[in-house]
Design a protein with these regions (language model features):
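Rossmann-fold NAD(P)-binding glycine/threonine-rich loop
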Residues: 47, 53-63, 70-111
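Flexible, glycine/charged-enriched surface loops at secondary-structure junctions
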Residues: 6, 160-163, 184-192, 290-301, ...
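General beta-strand structural signal in soluble alpha/beta enzymes
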Residues: 27-28, 45, 68-70, 93-97, ...
């Protein structure tokens, strides 16, 4: 028979004082009160950062308390270890809110898609950068102006580095790749680029190609299935892709399984209520699985598990300038084979742009170095999502 279980907040740990707050009596400043209280079965960590979150969470798990977190930095760096502590002590470590805010993604991958072998995923994982790129694409705003608008609207921090340099998306890629492929992926294993070098000229060339520029976090299995590639970078996305129509602060994650094909998870990737929705959902899941651990986790990875991103197959968009433009274009056609030339209104006479065929990025960049007389202005990866 189903038995309803009541949940009650017993403590709120914070170093600040909150006089007059409706929950004023719940606030404490000593973590050990929580750790040593046998009535506390589930602990929620939302402080962010690696320390002291790691010390607090590991202590709780070792004390037989389940933990729910929204802390992507913690899970990306220490997820395998903390899941191990949870298994050892028959409790749960859940982190649905660490990727995609309120978008259900961790549980669907681990449960609903469990019958699939996941081959790859690609996602718009950061709302700040997606808002900036949307304004550049739809309104013709320069990067600096779009960033300021994002800050004015509360979508970007005063120091936006973690977002615009790709670090936030990198942590989410680590979590998703670990979950999808079964071995831990660490942040320093993921090649990471941001959007600070994207210009309106690139946006216009992407439009002529037939798509838009998005900051994508991606991972895929190698052909032999023994390794993976993982990368965060701007990418050309075809207009027909579901990812191309994801605008402003929304996130979307495309997952490719051998049985299901392509599945896309879409929604608000940040914000108080979406994040709270995911956190509370995990708390309820812990309550439903009291005294029994969910089969959930991954193994640690060996050296070389994440392959060099330069060996990953891709096409490249190339923007360049050359005094002898036609001669260099002819050389590019001989070097790369069939290339797609792009155009934009108002381009200088010496500027040109093209998209290469698919090859390993290492091979493509080696060939670019042989284009004598060409000054390469920018390159962006081209995807098939």
């Amino acid at each position: 028979m189903y038995k309803r279980q009541e949940l009650e907040i017993k403590y709120i740990l914070d170093l600040k004082d909150f006089p007059g707050d409706p929950n004023e009596k719940l606030f404490i400043k000593d973590f050990n009160i929580i750790l040593n209280d046998p009535e506390v079965k589930v602990v929620v960590e939302t402080m962010g950062g690696l320390h002291p979150a790691y010390e607090f969470v590991s202590a709780c798990l070792k004390a037989g308390k389940s933990v729910v977190t929204s802390n992507k930095e913690l899970v990306a760096a220490k997820g395998c270890e903390l899941l191990g502590y949870a298994a050892e002590h028959n409790v749960n470590f859940l982190f649905e809110a660490s990727v995609g805010g309120g978008i259900p993604i961790i549980r669907p991958i681990s449960q609903c898609l469990a019958a699939n072998e996941i081959n790859e995923f690609a996602g718009i994982l950061n709302g700040t950068t997606n808002f900036i790129l949307t304004r550049m694409i739809n309104d013709g705003m320069a990067f600096e102006d779009a960033l300021k608008l994002a800050q004015d609207n509360g979508y970007a921090e005063r120091d936006p580095s973690a977002d615009i340099l790709g670090f936030d998306a990198c942590r989410k890629v680590c979590i998703l790749a670990s979950l999808c492929f079964g071995k831990h992926v660490y942040p320093d294993q993921v090649h990471t680029e941001g959007i600070t070098e994207i210009t309106l000229e690139d946006v216009e060339y992407a439009k002529d190609w037939g798509g838009v520029i998005k900051l994508l976090g991606r991972a895929r299995k190698s052909e032999d299935g023994k390794h993976i590639y993982a990368i965060v970078s701007p990418a050309f996305v075809d207009h027909h892709s579901q990812l191309a129509s994801v605008d402003d602060v929304f996130n979307a994650i495309l997952v490719r399984g051998d049985a299901i094909g392509d599945v896309v998870f879409y929604g608000r990737g940040a914000g108080k209520l979406p994040t709270a929705s995911a956190v509370v959902g995990d708390v309820i899941d812990c309550a439903r699985h009291e005294n029994k651990q969910k089969f959930f986790g991954w193994a640690d990875s060996e050296e070389g598990y994440v392959s060099d991103y330069l060996d990953m197959p891709t096409a490249l968009y190339v923007r360049a300038r050359a005094q002898q433009k036609q001669q260099v274009i002819s050389s590019a056609e001989k070097t790369f084979g069939e290339i797609k030339l792009l155009k934009r209104a108002g381009a200088p006479e010496d500027e040109f742009a093209f998209v290469t065929p698919v090859a390993s990025e290492r091979e493509l960049r080696t060939k670019l170095e042989t284009l004598l007389g060409a000054e390469i202005i920018s390159t962006i990866r081209v995807t098939d999502y």
